[in-house]
Amino acid sequence: MKVYSEPKITVPKFCEENGFYTTKQRSHNMSRIRGKNTKPEKLLKKALWHTGLHYRSNKRRLPGKPDITFIKYKLVVFIDGSFWHGYDWDTRKKSIKSNRGFWIPKIERNMQRDREINQYYLSKGWTLLRFWDFEVKKELGVCVKRVMDAIAVFP
């Protein structure tokens, strides 16, 4: 059984019996959201590949399924969606209008899981980089440089 450093946030199941309702259009929109190989991920992966860096994508055996993994350098890279991972959460959570009882615990649990994953990798001696999706889109060169710098300092 896993021991949490803070109380685990429980997220109610998203179903109509629990009072969470969704329209067919919303359901369709949500089904189109990708969990891997998003545009920001593809951008960063392509840029890294062009620099000659070779990596593994979405390594399932590693906790949190890192978007990019450099096993040789013990480096994992996560590209977090700003909504799903709680960018500017204190401000954003006020703007959620529907199904607040589901979405607020859902995002807060995602944030808690991110902290747990960070702690895991750091405790194992790995280097971990997290980029927001908009950082990759707007400052791709900076993100690539941070990855290359992390690799350069590897013993």
Q: What kind of feature is each model-predicted range?
A:
Residues 1-130, 134-155:
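Nucleic-acid endo/exonuclease domains
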